[in-house]
Amino acid sequence: MPESPPLPKRSPLMTSSTTRPASDYPPGGDAFRHRHLTGIAQLTPWEISYILDAAEEWVELNRSGAAKHDDRLAGLTIINAFFENSTRTLLSFEIAGKRLGADVVNMHAAQSSVKKGETLIDTAMTLNAMRADAIVIRHASSGAVQLIADKVDCPVLNAGDGRHEHPTQALLDALTIRRRLGRVEGLAIAICGDVLHSRVARSNILALTLLGNEVRVVAPATLTPPAMERMHVRCFTDMDEGLKGADVVMMLRLQNERMDGAHLPSAREYHALYGLTPQRLEKAKPDAIVMHPGPMNRGVEIDSSVADDHARSTITEQVEMGVAVRMACLDILTRRQRGVPGWN
């Protein structure tokens, strides 16, 4: 995808919890120029804010029940092509599409011809021939989503590809932070755990640094990606040091399916050094929030008493924000093909 031209300057950047309507932006191409959403890396701070502001509206419409009567995507077909197992993300995209009135078709890895030896390019050509109006893809290989996006005629949304990116997770996390803390800039945010294998961590680092936060990576050396300084983060191997003064503590699960035993000796030792306990959380600010993208390994990276502390834990709120963010993304990316005025 060619690099988007710079957007016109706006001041200030819209990141506070009090948002203007998403309609109060320059029309169409001046607001959001992308055909696909393959990663946070393609977005500007202003474009991230644009999506978050649109999602804010969907949060309130979902809570009031009004979103169930929305039909702006009526007549459109969305294919959720998940080549990796998923519960939260798949259900979230399915609910998002249906609340917007679209016909939603879920394709699971076990049902796909990939299991029979079909190449990813052939799968992309097959999906394109079915004339879907949008395709949501999760795949175990980094870059698979971009490969498919290059072969199809409709918008493609990345629901997670290998270790690469998970953009809607980062967007929903940013929205959760903004609603809880009133802003999503100028904060100290500690991302803790298996950062090496985490596409969630990568997308969050990209988004949160772009929005002007101090991002810290807290992990064993064996689970810290190389050259992290290029991503403008501070790295800590000591959990207590990494949590000092943090506004946000984001925990990540150990992705055992993507690692071998060489990365850490045991789950018990990992919990002793990197598990988030009430005592360890005291190192962060008194009003710090605790996040986790799920699924959680209780008693490994996070204690149940911390995960279930609703005053500080945002875990269920993140799930709610996920539906709103994905509704916003589906709406925005299909505006051109729906002929929305200003989105030519």
Swiss-Prot record:
Pathway per the UniProt entry: Pyrimidine metabolism; UMP biosynthesis via de novo pathway; (S)-dihydroorotate from bicarbonate: step 2/3
Region (Disordered): 1-30
Family recorded in the similarity comment: Belongs to the aspartate/ornithine carbamoyltransferase superfamily. ATCase family.
Protein name: Aspartate carbamoyltransferase catalytic subunit
GO biological process, one term: 'de novo' UMP biosynthetic process
Enzyme class at the top of the EC tree: transferase
Assembly with partners or alone: Heterododecamer (2C3:3R2) of six catalytic PyrB chains organized as two trimers (C3), and six regulatory PyrI chains organized as three dimers (R2).
Record-level GO cellular component terms: cytosol
Chain segments annotated as transmembrane: none
Source domain of life: Bacteria
Gene expressing this chain: pyrB
Function: Catalyzes the condensation of carbamoyl phosphate and aspartate to form carbamoyl aspartate and inorganic phosphate, the committed step in the de novo pyrimidine nucleotide biosynthesis pathway.
Catalysed reaction equations from the record: carbamoyl phosphate + L-aspartate = N-carbamoyl-L-aspartate + phosphate + H(+)
Residues annotated for carbamoyl phosphate binding in this entry: R88, T89, R138, H166, Q169, G294, P295
InterPro entries xrefs: Asp/Orn_carbamoyltranf_P-bd (IPR006132), Asp/Orn_carbamoylTrfase (IPR006130), Asp/Orn_carbamoylTrfase_sf (IPR036901), Asp_carbamoyltransf (IPR002082), Asp_carbamoyltransf_Asp/Orn-bd (IPR006131)
GO molecular function, a single term: amino acid binding
Ion transport keyword on record: no
EC number: 2.1.3.2
Signal peptide extent: none
Binding site for L-aspartate: K116, R199, R253
